[in-house]
Amino acid sequence: MANDPIHQFQVSRWIPIDVGGVDLSFTNVSAFMVATVVLASGFLYLTSSGRGLIPTRLQSVSEMAYEFVATSLRDSAGSKGMKFFPFVFSLFMFVLVANFIGLFPYFYTVTSQIIVTFALSLLVIGTVIFYGFFKHGFGFLKLFVPSGVPGIIVPLVVLIEIISFLSRPISLSVRLFANMLAGHITLKVFAGFVVSLSSLGALGIGGTVLPLLMTVAITALEFLVAFLQAYVFTVLTCMYINDAVHPGH
């Protein structure tokens, strides 16, 4: 088990729940999603309450997160898109905290599960579609008809735009899932090398130096990837929201 890089992604039932043949068990994934929400909410509450003129380091971090999301949303969707700020900020904090939690030993990375990332992506696309039709009616369909396209190729362009739009939740979810999965597998493999070689005695201990250095380097890289994936997910979400706010190209 120690050297199995896939074992860390196993879903375990903690509280079995069966309702009419539907498995609604509370799993380790469920527990760490709850933990992610609690930690993110607690962090924001502690850093935003009792703010002083001179911000603490943690307060500065929360303000940087706030400004990043606000700037990204404003740049992508304009002032009208700011109504989606609570939604986008919540997504950013959830993905960011979930990614960071998974980097600690014996903790679970919920964003390494495709069902979790796909659910987040469907939430984004569902929000875009709902608001687009709610605000613009059938005018939202102008999203699939770019302006300035010659009439003879409009059907082909519309088909391409529809396929591109429908592929968004797939690309958005797979990008996050694949990066977190691959990074953790690589980290586990090199950590396994260290454990295996150290059990060989003095000769093995000498051979652990390179794998150990690689493990440290990959761990540092994974912290960067954890932030970058939350960053990319948020920026793309802001761009998709712009399509709902301004469906015309």
UniProtKB/Swiss-Prot annotation:
The keyword Membrane applies. NCBIfam families: ATP_synt_6_or_A (TIGR01131), PRK05815.2-4 (NF004482). It is a multi-pass membrane protein. Its main location: membrane. The chain crosses the membrane at residues 26-46, 84-104, 114-134, 143-163, 185-205, 208-228. Key component of the proton channel; it plays a direct role in the translocation of protons across the membrane. Keywords: ATP synthesis, Cell inner membrane, Cell membrane, CF(0), Hydrogen ion transport, Ion transport, Membrane, Transmembrane, Transmembrane helix, Transport. It holds the Pfam family ATP-synt_A. CDD domains: ATP-synt_Fo_a_6 (cd00310). The gene is atpB. It is found in: Cell inner membrane. This is ATP synthase subunit a. InterPro entries: ATP_synth_F0_asu, ATP_synth_F0_asu_AS, ATP_synth_F0_asu_bact/mt, F0_ATP_A_sf. F-type ATPases have 2 components, CF(1) - the catalytic core - and CF(0) - the membrane proton channel. CF(1) has five subunits: alpha(3), beta(3), gamma(1), delta(1), epsilon(1). CF(0) has three main subunits: a(1), b(2) and c(9-12). The alpha and beta chains form an alternating ring which encloses part of the gamma chain. CF(1) is attached to CF(0) by a central stalk formed by the gamma and epsilon chains, while a peripheral stalk is formed by the delta and b chains. GO terms for cellular component: plasma membrane; proton-transporting ATP synthase complex. One of its GO terms (molecular function) is proton-transporting ATP synthase activity, rotational mechanism. Belongs to the ATPase A chain family. The keyword Electron transport does not apply.
